[in-house]
Amino acid sequence: MTTQNRHLSGKVAWVTGSSRGIGRVVADHLAGCGATVAVHGTTPTSARAFNEAESLAAVAEAIAAAHGTETLAVHGDLSREAEVKRAAAEIRARFGRIDILVNCAGGDIGAAGTGAADAGRPQRNDALNISPEDMQAVFDRNLMSCVWCCREVAPEMMARRAGHIVNFGSNAGLVGDEVGAMYATAKAAVTHYSRCLAAQLRRYNVAVNVVAPGTIVTARIIASNQVQPDRLNESGRLDRYGWPIEIARLVEFLVSDANTYITGQVLRIDGGEQLWPA
């Protein structure tokens, strides 16, 4: 059983893209803080990619068992509005509402999906040569999933005059880069959409912020051959890769009652990899 501070007790959190990777750790951490958590994957077996779990249901059950809180597994392609509405309806039918939305779903993953080479990264992955199919897949996975989920959840938060939305950007979305150009562009769009949404929702007391991670060690990142072994240092040094729990702690603050005056902001968490303004 968890020994964390249960300051999120009574809150219902939907963490998209939480069948594995950063999203799974965020969901687990929020549950440890007392939140009721809906975990999400594209399919019931999304968690099997990179051997992180047997099923989405198994992830939800493990989180519930670890922290003694209620969980629910929902699946769906969040780039499709109808599937977003269905997943949200399942959460509301079980828990009555959604207080917290964390949009972790995304990734530099093309049309072939995570089962392709390099963990699904598009093969011609630059601004001039990426295929139309891969480009659409990257934008759907990162931008449109975020837009549809925010549009679905924001109205009930506005009506209650309370709520927190955290969208996942990326350091890649704050700089130009030849490789992964469409992913960087999609994450830049997520960032600016979030600023626009924050401006619209602040009068309703709904906070919208962006977490922009640097390179965070997950099974997919390792499988995509992007990791330099000498930076896999878990000590207190900053010139290393980050770990999902470090992201989860930042999300915890942003969705808690301690956050009373932060909205529309991009919070880098990258160990100082980028030191210029967002």
Regions found by a protein language model. Give the residues of each.
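Catalytic Tyr-X3-Lys loop
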Residues: 120-147, 162, 166, 190, ...
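A glycine/serine/threonine-rich, flexible loop-to-helix segment
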Residues: 51-52, 114-123, 182, 203, ...
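Residue(s) in the substrate-gating loop at a strand-loop-helix junction
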Residues: 170
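Active-site helix of classical SDR
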Residues: 150, 186, 194
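Alpha-helical segment proximal to the catalytic Tyr-Lys
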Residues: 155, 199-200, 260
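C-terminal helical subdomain
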Residues: 144-147, 203, 210, 230-262, ...
